[in-house]
């Protein structure tokens, strides 16, 4: 069994390709169930967001697994396989596992270190677990990846530094005021950048939002998003008297506010600090405003400097997380190796118990006078001998499975005890049991989703 990842993301495919390969939230479960029916696919989890569609699978053979996953994507989205082939990225084995750790931790995201992807990865995994398309290997891998991503964010603080201009304004405002609870925000202009800044400020607990714009109707539309107040441009002076934070993004020719216009208003504000952010190009606010004692003025270049510094901090944190991933891969690899030893141990126990059972039958034939109590005592003690004899070989085979050259070591172990065929039988039995469990889980999910009147 092998782990494989097949898919596209913002690095490998343009948006016009990604949008053609995006699974809707409502169809994701059905897609995973259909993929599970394909040849070679033993387990699968599909992660689909605006920036990526990736299929994580456990396959019995890599080449057939790759083929059927690609064919499934082409058939599901009714697109020629050749049309998407150049954009598909395929990772196998340890590289596939490492990719999931990076995705969950936000290292493979367009915004380095973002946390939204972690929730999306967890949601896909829980859905696959619920409908039965994931199994022993992917359940362990995804659970480990989600747990690791949470720890990585907590220990490195990778998401603590703003890397967008709009959120950098929030970060600076917090440095000046300490907190934003109850602060009055004034938005000058109804442009995209101003809107984003207002959304981030509003999400951080500001009290009131006022929007001033040349067109009052646009001001009303934006203000409505924040239960705020709209004012015309002629009311700017009054709005400035009340504001604690000003975001300006009109891009008009000439300054919307000069030092001379603000100076008398500053006196009327009685020393209250005013945080002003000019994210317009050309600038809206007179740079001389910074000369006023209670005015803290920042422009787009100041914010870009903050973003650049924060991005550098995130990159340092990302480097630490990459080192942490190496340890996670070692741990997962060791677990995966011990998984392969389970049927070996089971086959060894079965052979030993079969010998014990034959020995008991022989004793009963040769000693027919034995009482029922005597038989029970003999059975108990012969089983005890078997368990004691097996203890050291089982401990040793577990160590072999976790060490270097594990496959060769296990093959030699099986040859010594002549259990090669028995191990294969155990593996087939385990696979049948897993398929049966998956089918039962899928059937139960279908029954649960069926309306009560159809039951």
Curated annotation (Swiss-Prot):
Keywords: NADP, Oxidoreductase, Porphyrin biosynthesis. SUPFAM superfamilies: Glutamyl tRNA-reductase catalytic, N-terminal domain, Glutamyl tRNA-reductase dimerization domain, NAD(P)-binding Rossmann-fold domains. Its EC number is 1.2.1.70. The active site is at 50 (nucleophile). Pathway: Porphyrin-containing compound metabolism; protoporphyrin-IX biosynthesis; 5-aminolevulinate from L-glutamyl-tRNA(Glu): step 1/2. The keyword NADP applies. GO terms for molecular function: glutamyl-tRNA reductase activity; NADP binding. NADP(+) binds at residues 189-194. It comes from the Bacteria. Homodimer. Possesses an unusual extended V-shaped dimeric structure with each monomer consisting of three distinct domains arranged along a curved 'spinal' alpha-helix. The N-terminal catalytic domain specifically recognizes the glutamate moiety of the substrate. The second domain is the NADPH-binding domain, and the third C-terminal domain is responsible for dimerization. Catalyzes the NADPH-dependent reduction of glutamyl-tRNA(Glu) to glutamate 1-semialdehyde (GSA). During catalysis, the active site Cys acts as a nucleophile attacking the alpha-carbonyl group of tRNA-bound glutamate with the formation of a thioester intermediate between enzyme and glutamate, and the concomitant release of tRNA(Glu). The thioester intermediate is finally reduced by direct hydride transfer from NADPH, to form the product GSA. NCBIfam families: hemA (TIGR01035), PRK00045.1-3 (NF000744). This is Glutamyl-tRNA reductase. The gene is hemA.
């Amino acid at each position: 069994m092998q782990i494989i990842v097949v898919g596209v993301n913002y690095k490998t495919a343009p948006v016009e390709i990604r949008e053609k390969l995006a699974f809707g939230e409502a169809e994701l479960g059905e897609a995973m169930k259909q993929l599970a029916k394909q040849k070679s696919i033993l387990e699968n989890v599909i992660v689909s967001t605006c920036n990526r569609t990736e299929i994580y699978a456990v396959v019995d053979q890599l080449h057939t697994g790759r083929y059927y996953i690609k064919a499934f994507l082409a058939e599901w989205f009714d697109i020629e396989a050749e049309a998407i082939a150049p954009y598909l990225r395929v990772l196998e084995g340890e590289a596939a596992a490492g990719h999931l750790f990076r995705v969950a931790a936000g290292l493979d995201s367009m915004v380095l270190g973002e946390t939204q992807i972690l929730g999306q990865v967890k949601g896909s995994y829980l859905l696959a677990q619920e409908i039965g398309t994931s199994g022993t290997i992917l359940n362990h891998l995804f659970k480990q990846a989600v747990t690791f991503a949470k720890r990585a964010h907590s220990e490195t603080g990778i998401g603590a530094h703003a890397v967008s201009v709009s959120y950098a304004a929030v970060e600076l405002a917090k440095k000046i005021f300490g907190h934003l609870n109850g602060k009055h925000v004034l938005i000058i202009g109804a442009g995209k950048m101003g809107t984003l800044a207002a959304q981030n400020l509003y999400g951080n607990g500001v009290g009131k939002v006022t929007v001033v714009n040349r067109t009052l109707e646009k001001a009303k539309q934006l203000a409505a998003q924040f239960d705020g107040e709209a004012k015309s441009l002629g009311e700017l002076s009054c709005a400035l008297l009340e504001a604690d934070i000003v975001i300006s993004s009109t891009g008009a020719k000439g300054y919307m506010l000069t030092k001379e216009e603000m100076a008398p208003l500053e006196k009327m504000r009685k020393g209250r600090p005013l945080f002003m952010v000019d994210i317009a190009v050309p600038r809206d606010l007179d740079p001389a405003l910074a000369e006023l004692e209670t005015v803290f003025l920042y422009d787009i270049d100041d914010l870009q400097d903050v973003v650049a510094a924060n991005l550098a901090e995130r990159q340092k944190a990302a480097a630490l997380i990459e080192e942490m991933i190496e340890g996670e891969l070692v741990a997962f690899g060791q677990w995966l190796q011990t998984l392969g030893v389970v049927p070996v141990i089971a086959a060894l126990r079965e052979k030993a118990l079969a010998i014990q059972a034959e020995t008991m039958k022989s004793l009963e034939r040769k000693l027919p006078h034995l009482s029922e109590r005597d038989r029970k005592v003999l059975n108990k003690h012969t089983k005890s001998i078997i368990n004691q004899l097996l203890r050291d070989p089982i401990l040793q085979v577990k160590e072999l499975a976790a060490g270097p050259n594990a496959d060769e070591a296990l093959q030699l172990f099986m040859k010594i005890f002549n259990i090669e065929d028995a191990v294969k039988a155990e593996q087939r039995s385990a696979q049948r049991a897993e398929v049966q469990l998956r089918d039962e889980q899928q059937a139960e999910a279908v029954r649960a989703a069926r309306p009560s009147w159809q039951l």
